[in-house]
Amino acid sequence: MSASIIAIDAMGGDFGPHCIVPACISALAEFPSLHLALVGQAPLIEEQLARQSGVDRSRLQVHHASEVIAMDERPAQALRGKPDASMRVALELVRQRQAHACVSAGNTGALMALSRYVLKTLPGIDRPAMVSPIPTERGHCYLLDLGANVDCSAEHLYQFAIMGAVAAETLGVARPRVALLNVGTEDIKGNQQVKLAASLLLQARGLNFIGYIEGDGVYRGEADVVVCDGFVGNILLKASEGLAKMITGRVETLFNEGLFAQAVGALAMPLLRRLKADLAPARHNGASFLGLQGIVVKSHGAAGQESFQSAIRCALREVQENLPQRLHGRLEDLLL
C-alpha cells in the first residue's frame, strides 16, 4: 500500500453514517493522498454518499458489514456474537493490511476487546492504553489511560508510561517529561499501585520520569506525559471538557448582559473565538490505542462531523509517523 488507507467504522457512535460519511468526505478534501474504506451497512452508507457533492469515489471504498455493535453492548457479546459487525470488519482490514488504521466512534469496551483479539498487542505489553492530547498552558500534554483499563496494576501503569513517552517522542516531543497523576507530589502520597509504579519508573533507563503530578499541574503543563488508570483518566478528561464548555459559555453570557457588555464583547469576540477553538473538544478528539500491532483511534461517541474529522487526522498522522513500528523498536530497548 503506497497511499494512506484508513478503515472507518461508519456505523459507530451516536449518529452513525449521518455524521460519519460527511466527515469522511471533508477529510478526503483536506488530504488529497488519503484513501478511506467505509465499513457498515452499504445501503445506509450509499444513501448518505448520494447526499454529498464532489465525492471522489476513486479514493473511497464501501465494505458491507451486516451487523452493528450497540453502544451499550457487552464487549464479550460483541466479540463472540457479531462476526460481521462493522467495527470488527474494519479492524480485519487493518490486520489483513488492506488498511493502515481504523477509526471508530463505537462502543469503547467492544473496540478495545476486538482490537486486542484481532490485532494483538506488541511484545512486552499486557494491555493497550487509550491516549489523547489535552490542552495546557504550554500547549498540550498526553494523558493515558482514558478509560480502557479501569483497574490497573503497577506494572500496567509502568507500561503505559513507557508507551506514552515513546509516542510523545515519535510525535515530536524531545525528551518528554513523564509523571504519575497523584493526590500529592510527596513520596508518601498515593495508593499502593501508584507507589509501586513510581519505584519501577525510577529504575527505567532512558526515561525522563519527574515523579508525581497533581491535577492542577496537568493544566500548568508541568509534564508532557501524564499517567493514571482509566477510571481516573476518564473522569479527568470528561471534567475538563465540561469545564471548558462552562467557562466559554459563561463568558459569552456575560458579554450579552447590557449594552456596555455587548460593546466590550464585540471587541473581544476574535479573542473569544480563539479561546473556544483552543479549548473545543472537537479539536482534540481522537484517542489512540497504544500497544497494538496496528493503529486504532477511538472517536468520542457523541462526535459531530468536525470532531470525527479530527479523529481521522489523528489516525493519519500516526500512519505517517509509522507509530506502531517505532513504538515496537523503542519498547524492545525499554521493556524486553
Swiss-Prot record:
MF terms (GO), sorted A to Z: phosphate:acyl-[acyl carrier protein] acyltransferase activity
Annotated pathway: Lipid metabolism; phospholipid metabolism
Keyword vocabulary terms for this entry: Cytoplasm, Lipid biosynthesis, Lipid metabolism, Phospholipid biosynthesis, Phospholipid metabolism, Transferase
Catalytic activity field: a fatty acyl-[ACP] + phosphate = an acyl phosphate + holo-[ACP]
Short name of one Pfam family: FA_synthesis
Cellular component aspect of the GO annotation: cytoplasm
EC annotation from Swiss-Prot or TrEMBL: 2.3.1.274
Intracellular or extracellular location(s): Cytoplasm
Keyword Ligase: no
Methyltransferase found in the keyword field: no
Gene Ontology biological process terms, A to Z: fatty acid biosynthetic process; phospholipid biosynthetic process
Top-level class of the enzyme under EC nomenclature: transferase
Function: Catalyzes the reversible formation of acyl-phosphate (acyl-PO(4)) from acyl-[acyl-carrier-protein] (acyl-ACP). This enzyme utilizes acyl-ACP as fatty acyl donor, but not acyl-CoA.
Assigned protein family: Belongs to the PlsX family.
Assembly and binders: Homodimer. Probably interacts with PlsY.
PANTHER family (UniProt xref): FATTY ACID/PHOSPHOLIPID SYNTHESIS PROTEIN PLSX, PHOSPHATE ACYLTRANSFERASE
Name of the protein this chain belongs to: Phosphate acyltransferase
Organism for this UniProt entry: Ectopseudomonas mendocina (strain ymp) (Pseudomonas mendocina)
